[in-house]
C-alpha cells in the first residue's frame, strides 16, 4: 500500500475521540430511523416517503417529525427525545462491549451464547436471534450459562430460516471500533458472534461491517472499502452488495436502484440493507446528516441502517453535529438484564479501554490474516 494512501493510526486520545463519535453516530442514526422502522418494513417505501413528506421531513436532515394516526413511535421524533430509547441495535452493541471486556480477543461463540442467556431477554430478540435462543433454551445444559459446556453442537442454533437476514450485521460495529487498523481481527471477532445465529451471507455482512469500521481508522475511505472486502469471499452475495452500493455512490436514485435490484428480498435482509448502507455512507462521507438521512429515507430496515451508517461515519473521526446528540443528552436506555440505562461517557471510556487492551495484547488471532501493515 502506498504510504500516501494511509492515515496515521490513532493515538489513545484520538482513539477515544473517534470512539465517542462512533457511539454518537450510531445512537443518533438509530434514533432517527426508529420511529419509522415498522412503517417502512410493513407498508413499504412509498408509505415511508408519504409520511416523511407529511411532517416536513424531506429531505431528511433532522429527527423525524410526528403526527398521530400513522403508527409512528413518538418518543424518538423531533422535539420529543429526552434520551436514546431502547433498541435492539444498541442492546447488541453494548452486549458486544460487555463480552469484549471479559474475553477480549479470546471471545468464543459459546461466550456469546452464555451472554444471551444471562443478559438478553428472549422478548428482545427477533427472527434469527429468537430462533437461536429457542434452540439454546431447549438443548443447552442447565449449567451452560454459568460456564459448563453446552452439551450439544452450537451450530444447530444457526439452522433457521432467517440466517441470512440482518441480525448479525447489527451486532458487529463495536468489534471494528476496538480494532483500529486490524480489519482481519475485527472480522474474526464479528464472525464468532455472528455464527451463533447466522450462516453464509448473514455472517459475511457482520464481518464486513466490523472490518470496515476497523479499516477506516488506518486508511482512506476508498481503501478501507477494499480492505474490508478482503475479509469475505469475493463471490459472496455480500461482496456483490457492497460493490453495488459503492458503484451507486453519489447517484441520487441509488436507493431506488438498490430496492429494485433486490425486489422480493425481505426488508430485513442482509444484502439489500448493506447495499443501502454503503451507498448512503460513500455518497456523503463529508456530511453526517445527509449520510444517515438518506440511509433512513431509502427505507427497508431504517433504524438498523441509520445506526450502521452513523457508527461508520463517526469512526472516521469527524465531529457529529450537536443537533443530533443534544436531544438525547448522553442518556442511553437499554433492554438488557440489569442494565436499564448507561451514559455515553461510560460507553466511550469502556470501549476505549477495550481497544487499548487489545492493542497491548498484540494483533491476536486473525482468520484471514489481512490486517493493515
Question: Where on the chain are the PLM-derived regions?
Answer:
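Structured, active/binding-site neighborhoods that engage oxygen-rich ligands
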Residues: 1-373
Amino acid at each position: 500500500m502506498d504510504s500516501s494512501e494511509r492515515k496515521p493510526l490513532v493515538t489513545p486520545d484520538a482513539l477515544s475521540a473517534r470512539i465517542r463519535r462512533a457511539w454518537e453516530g450510531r445512537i443518533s442514526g438509530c434514533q432517527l430511523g426508529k420511529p419509522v422502522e415498522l412503517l417502512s418494513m410493513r407498508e413499504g417505501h412509498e408509505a415511508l416517503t408519504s409520511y416523511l413528506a407529511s411532517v416536513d421531513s424531506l429531505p431528511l436532515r433532522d429527527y423525524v417529525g410526528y403526527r398521530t394516526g400513522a403508527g409512528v413511535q413518538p418518543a424518538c421524533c423531533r422535539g420529543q427525545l429526552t434520551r436514546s430509547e431502547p433498541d435492539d441495535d444498541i442492546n447488541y452493541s453494548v452486549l458486544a462491549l460487555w463480552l469484549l471486556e471479559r474475553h477480549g480477543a479470546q471471545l468464543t461463540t459459546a461466550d456469546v451464547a452464555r451472554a444471551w442467556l444471562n443478559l438478553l431477554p428472549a422478548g428482545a430478540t427477533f427472527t434469527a436471534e429468537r430462533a437461536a435462543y429457542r434452540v439454546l433454551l431447549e438443548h443447552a445444559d442447565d449449567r451452560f450459562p454459568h460456564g459448563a459446556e453446552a452439551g450439544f453442537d452450537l451450530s444447530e442454533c444457526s439452522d433457521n430460516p432467517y440466517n441470512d437476514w440482518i441480525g448479525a450485521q447489527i451486532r458487529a460495529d463495536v468489534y471494528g471500533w476496538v480494532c483500529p487498523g486490524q480489519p482481519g481481527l475485527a472480522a474474526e471477532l464479528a464472525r464468532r458472534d455472528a455464527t451463533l445465529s447466522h450462516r453464509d451471507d448473514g455472517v459475511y455482512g457482520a464481518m464486513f461491517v466490523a472490518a470496515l469500521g476497523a479499516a477506516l481508522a488506518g486508511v482512506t475511505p476508498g481503501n478501507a472499502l477494499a480492505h474490508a472486502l478482503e475479509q469475505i469471499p469475493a463471490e459472496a452475495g455480500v461482496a456483490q452488495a457492497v460493490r453495488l452500493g459503492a458503484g451507486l455512490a453519489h447517484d441520487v436514485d441509488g436507493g431506488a436502484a438498490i430496492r429494485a435490484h433486490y425486489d422480493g428480498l425481505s426488508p430485513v435482509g442482509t444484502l439489500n440493507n448493506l447495499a443501502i448502507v454503503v451507498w448512503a455512507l460513500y455518497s456523503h462521507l463529508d456530511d453526517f446528516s445527509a449520510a444517515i438521512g438518506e440511509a433512513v429515507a431509502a427505507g427497508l430496515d431504517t433504524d438498523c441502517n441509520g445506526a450502521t451508517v452513523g457508527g461508520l461515519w463517526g469512526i472516521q473521526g469527524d465531529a457529529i453535529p450537536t443537533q443530533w446528540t443534544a436531544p438525547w443528552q448522553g442518556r442511553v436506555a437499554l433492554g438488557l438484564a440489569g442494565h436499564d440505562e448507561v451514559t455515553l461517557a461510560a460507553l466511550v471510556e469502556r470501549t476505549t479501554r477495550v481497544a487499548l487492551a487489545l492493542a497491548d495484547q498484540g494483533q491476536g488471532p486473525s482468520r484471514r490474516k489481512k490486517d493493515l501493515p
